[in-house]
Amino acid sequence: MLKSLVVLLLTSRVIAFPTLDTDQTAALHKPQATPNSQGTHGGFFYYWWSDGQSPAAYTNLDGGSYCLRWESGGNLIGGKGWSPGTDNRTIQISGTFQGVENSYLAVYGWLETPKVEYYIVEYHGVFNPAYDAQILGTVICDGSVYDISRSTRVSSGGTKILPRYWSVRRNKRTGGTVQTGCHFDAWRSTGLSAADHGFQIVATEGYFSSGFAEMTVADTSAEE
């Protein structure tokens, strides 16, 4: 009888474990990404932004180098360059770029008056980021034909429509020299009038894609 009572007490005992509420559970499964930031490092301007939906690690390396590893899940962009930018800069790009799907390597920047965003796309995956842009023509720069086009985007605050200029290289590459003046001349011939450069970087961008990039940038304008 005593043995039966011990078994009954053991089997009827309730053990309570702490539980996570909804917010704690969401935080536990939230993708981890390097916090957004911009500034100077190693004598170069750097810019890093993600929407926080993709596991991603951005790291500034020595000089004009940076490293980015990311997994699919959202939108992100990062890289090194200069602030302010300029119409006429000779940029040397080297390193390793292993982006697939919707990812690209580009010279990326802003003009401030009025606000205009631009991309000189050196490499993209299966998805052309300028697929829905208005074709303006072509230009030959640095040994390849580039398709130049214009599109628009909504500002981050959702209050303005901003123009965006594209120059997409047909003969894709992940390194070499980019003469930005060739592209700005082409864009300005189609109506680009904005001046006063913001930053200008060699960027790795991903959108629901995955990949790895370790890139180095340099301004070789003075060597010409």
From Swiss-Prot:
Domain of life: Eukaryota
GO molecular function terms noted in the UniProt entry: endo-1,4-beta-xylanase activity
PROSITE patterns per the UniProt record, alphabetical: GH11_2, GH11_3
Residues at the active site: 117 (nucleophile), 205 (proton donor)
Enzyme nomenclature, EC number: 3.2.1.8
Record's signal peptide: 1-16
Function, in words: Endo-1,4-beta-xylanase involved in the hydrolysis of xylan, a major structural heterogeneous polysaccharide found in plant biomass representing the second most abundant polysaccharide in the biosphere, after cellulose. May act as an elicitor of plant defense responses in certain plants but does not exhibit any cell death when transiently expressed in N.benthamiana.
PANTHER family in UniProt: ENDO-1,4-BETA-XYLANASE, ENDO-1,4-BETA-XYLANASE A-RELATED
Annotated protein name in UniProt: Ethylene-inducing xylanase 5
Gene source species: Verticillium dahliae (strain VdLs.17 / ATCC MYA-4575 / FGSC 10137)
